[in-house]
């Protein structure tokens, strides 16, 4: 009996293992170190050297070379088509908060990083760099903050011109977002009454990627379950022998 249970346990592990191994399929990625992909409409955003952001981030996925830098108020759009069957979508990128972003303030009246998927808001939080007493609504989960209110180039140095960096790929808010369509449109914008010119405040992204949680083919489960039945039958025969 124990052998039979062990066999079924093995098959269960195989089922979940296959599901996990095939769970995420990358459908888009760019490090912005070549021509801008056709899937991205940058608006007024430009490929720009990362300056002192270089090296911040996980091994193999750190800031480096160029990133896509945008003025506040500008909309960057990523449009994907021909997506495979899936049950959820995942978004990952490094986010650079550059210079005097004002958080949730009264004057200026706030800088909110707003991300939508197919017109639906999936993220809207304020970011503050200018002074320590400003309110930043975004509370980064463990492992997301790479730098906070330090001079990483651009408008700095100066008390109002510090920078911050975040690995938003590590934030669970961007994982397992319900989605099943064959197309997906993401928009990225810092908006709010406090938006100002590029030489005062801006933002950038690097190592942008999108993956989907693929729906396993029905025959995969059928084959695994058939194999499990065979293993269980063989184990029972051995137990009786």
What are these regions (language model features)?
Residues 97-108, 194-197:
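Extended, low-complexity, turn-rich repeat/linker tracts enriched in Gly/Pro/Ser/Thr and Asp/Glu
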Residues 70-86, 111, 168-174:
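Short beta-strands within extracellular/lumenal beta-sheet-rich domains
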Residues 104-113, 202-203:
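Short coil-to-beta strand junction motifs in C2/discoidin
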Residues 30-36, 138-213:
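Terminal, low-complexity interaction segments
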Residues 48-79, 199-200:
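Surface-exposed, low-complexity/disordered Ser/Thr/Gly/Pro/Asn-rich loops and linkers
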Residues 24-48, 122-127:
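Extracellular carbohydrate-recognition regions
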Residues 83-92, 181-183:
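Extended extracellular/luminal ectodomain segments enriched in beta-structured repeat modules
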Residues 217-236:
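A short, hydrophobic C-terminal helix/tail in secreted or cell-surface proteins
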